[in-house]
Structure formats: structure tokens, C-alpha cells
Design a protein with these regions (language model features):
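Conserved phosphate-binding and hydrolysis motifs of nucleotide-dependent enzymes
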Residues: 48, 56, 218, 251, ...
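N-terminal regulatory/effector-sensing and dimerization cores
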Residues: 3-109
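Amphipathic alpha-helical segments enriched in hydrophobic/aromatic residues interleaved with Lys/Arg
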Residues: 104-166, 183
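Short hydrophobic/aromatic patch on the recognition helix
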Residues: 64, 209-213, 257-258, 262
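Short, Lys/Arg-enriched N-terminal segment that forms or immediately precedes the first helix
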Residues: 162-169, 212-217
Length: 281
């Protein structure tokens, strides 16, 4: 596995356009743990090939492909063995996306779920690349305009939700377990309950909790907690919080554990991420 210090990658974020974050990675063979993002994610493959595991399927992405990943959905996109790939990611604030969708469909959407996962549309791909270029140039107003124009056909064709007045699907007992575990883990990232404590609260075996949680989310409770901690750490780094404080506030026992986990989920060190973000402020 290649060192993260050798990966040619960059992040873009600016408080002048807070609903957008971009990541660009070039000629990388680095693999990722299964993870999720709070944002709606759109990826674009510029070079090489990628295998993306998402919603219990594996998608073979090639140059020119776009992939849509819904908020909070576990996934992993990794290169073919011994190969490299180059790609861009756009991470779009979910509430902002829902407002944009509502403007097109005429009613407020409550959840964001695209009916299409992989799309090959050469014209849309070029528009995507143009948005990324504008972001890194710092042309904020133009980037925002072109981003909204690029997204409009995506919203209309693939992401229009059903009206919220439709009856909700029934919940199973395992989903109640999963909901309880998620809420307890997210309630206090610094002092999250142990699996033993959760087992006592739910009157279930630890193995049962892990199995039900994995069935409903695609990942284990510990993987979910680590992912949540890293996402929170990224938000603190965007605000300029010192690394030592980010580690503690995100719930990591020490800097070493924080550093290792951050690399596993982002293929960047916390310092690399922070420096790349602040280059655009």
C-alpha cells in the first residue's frame, strides 16, 4: 500500500461556498475502508478503473463514469489490484440539495435518494470537470452558477422524491435496535457507550446487536462510530480547530489513534487535510 504522503491529492472547501467540498486524487492505488458521508456525493473517474461497493452491489467504474452516492450510505471505491486511478469527488450539503430538489419538484423532500447510481453522460461529465476547475481557481460565483446548472438535470431525472405524504414503510424490530445504537453512539462521541452497555440496555447479546446493525447499515457499530468521529473531525478542521483539540473532541483516546483512523477513512493525514482546505480560504 502506498504512503499517504506520496498520494497526489487535494481538497477544496471555502466558507464562501459552504455547501460544497471537493476532493481530487491523481494516479493513486490507495484503498479505503467502507465509510459514509453526511453529504450527497458525486464521483467522476478521469483515469483508470475503480470497483465501487455500494448498496450490496459492485460497480466497475471506468473513465467518463459518474457515480451518485446518497448521504449516510456505506460504500468503498478502490482501484483494481496493481492499478492506479484518478478521480474527483464533490460532496454536497444534504439540506442544500433537498432545497434545490424542492425548487424543482414543487414540494419539500425529506430524504435524498437517487434512482440512478452510475451514469455515463459525456456532456454532463465535461460540465462536472468544469465545476471542479472553477472551484480550484477560486471563481466562486461562477462555480456556484455552473454547479446548480449541472445538478438540475440530475435532480429532475434521477433524484425527484415521492411526496412526503406517502405512508412510511413499517419498521422491523432490528431497525429499532439499529436506531437506538445510532442515537446512543452519536449522542456523545467522546464518551460513547460500549457494546456491553448497549447489550444491557437492549437486553440483547452483543453478537445480535452487531449482526442486526450490519444488516441495516452495511457496517458494524464500531465502524459507524469511527466514521462519525472522522466526519466530525473534518468539520472541526474546516473551522481551524488545532489538531490536538480535534482528536479529543472527536472522541479518540490519543493522537496516534486519531491519525491512523483518519488515514484509513480519508487516505490523508489530518494535517494534510487541514492544509489543503485552508489553501482555498
Amino acid at each position: 500500500m502506498s504512503s499517504v504522503h506520496a498520494i497526489n491529492q487535494s481538497y477544496w472547501f471555502s466558507p464562501r461556498l459552504p455547501h460544497v467540498e471537493s476532493r481530487s486524487t491523481r494516479n493513486s492505488s490507495h484503498a479505503y475502508k467502507t465509510h459514509s458521508h453526511a453529504q450527497f456525493s458525486i464521483g467522476a473517474i478521469e483515469h483508470g478503473e475503480t470497483l465501487c461497493h455500494y448498496r450490496n452491489e459492485t460497480y466497475h467504474l471506468q473513465v467518463g463514469d459518474l457515480i451518485f452516492i446518497d448521504p449516510q450510505q456505506p460504500h468503498s471505491c478502490n482501484p483494481l489490484p496493481g492499478k492506479t486511478r484518478s478521480y474527483h469527488m464533490l460532496y454536497l450539503d444534504t439540506e442544500w440539495c433537498l432545497d434545490q430538489i424542492a425548487a424543482h419538484c414543487g414540494y419539500q423532500a425529506e430524504t435524498l435518494r437517487c434512482s440512478r447510481i452510475v451514469l455515463r453522460d459525456p456532456a454532463l461529465f465535461i460540465r462536472y470537470q468544469h465545476v471542479v476547475t472553477l472551484l480550484y481557481r477560486g471563481e466562486i460565483t461562477s462555480a456556484d452558477h455552473h454547479l446548480k446548472a449541472m445538478l438540475e438535470p440530475i435532480w429532475r431525472q434521477y433524484c425527484l422524491p415521492a411526496p412526503s405524504c406517502l405512508p412510511a414503510l413499517p419498521h422491523h424490530a432490528s431497525q429499532n435496535t439499529t436506531r437506538h445504537v445510532r442515537e446512543r453512539l452519536l449522542n456523545n462521541l467522546q464518551e460513547s457507550p460500549s457494546l456491553e452497555t448497549l447489550a444491557e440496555e437492549l437486553n440483547l447479546r452483543r453478537e445480535t446487536i452487531v449482526r442486526q446493525f450490519r444488516h441495516d447499515t452495511g457496517i458494524t457499530p464500531m465502524a459507524f462510530l469511527n466514521n462519525a468521529r472522522i466526519e466530525y473531525a473534518k468539520s472541526l478542521l474546516k473551522q481551524g480547530t488545532p489538531l490536538v483539540d480535534v482528536s479529543y473532541q472527536s472522541g479518540f483516546c490519543d493522537q496516534s489513534h486519531f491519525h491512523k483512523t483518519f488515514v484509513q477513512y480519508t487516505a490523508a493525514t489530518p494535517g494534510q487535510y487541514a492544509r489543503s482546505i485552508f489553501d482555498n480560504k
